[in-house]
Amino acid sequence: NQGQICLCGSRILIEDSIYENFKNRLIERVEQLKIGDPSDESTEIGSLISGDHRKKVLSYVDLAIEEGGEIITGLQYENPTGFEGGNWMKPVIIEGLSVNSRCSTEEIFGPIVTIHSFSSEQEVISIANNTDYGLAGSIWSSDIEKAQRVAKSINSGMIWINTWLHRDLRVPFGGVKKSGVGREGGMWSLDFFSEPMNICIKHD
């Protein structure tokens, strides 16, 4: 999906004790991603949906540089053979941004991620909640009790623990803040899609 769906996060918060190791492994994996024909099963990254959307996504790269960020991988266009007219771009990783920057708090809908370190549970919760959006997030930890505690403190409609995009149509789907109102899924869908009618009669 090239980061173009609502459930794709555009920032990763990394505990400072593993920050450098995680960053280096993330860069290595991102640079290995195969960009090309989406009908090829070995392809991992396809084209963006349109030229206008690519311009919008790339504008966030320019904004990140203006905000003091550093592009640590990505940015160059990829033009796979036979698909030169596509809206290609390599996934971008940005570090060095303030957690309050626009690039770190807005929805980008493209293959861009900002990375940030944190040193405490309260700090990561504060950073996670420092956005106008709240649809979904993912927590990765070997300490499930801590992960559950943090999940309950994050102002988001959905939190995955040690997984991502794991959907069950029987459970509620929806966000908070600017990420929407109400829930779909299971019995919640009946309320969401129902249109109750009120008929009021005055009797003499």
Which residue ranges define each predicted feature?
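Conserved C-terminal structural/oligomerization subdomain of aldehyde/semialdehyde dehydrogenase
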Residues: 34, 81-204
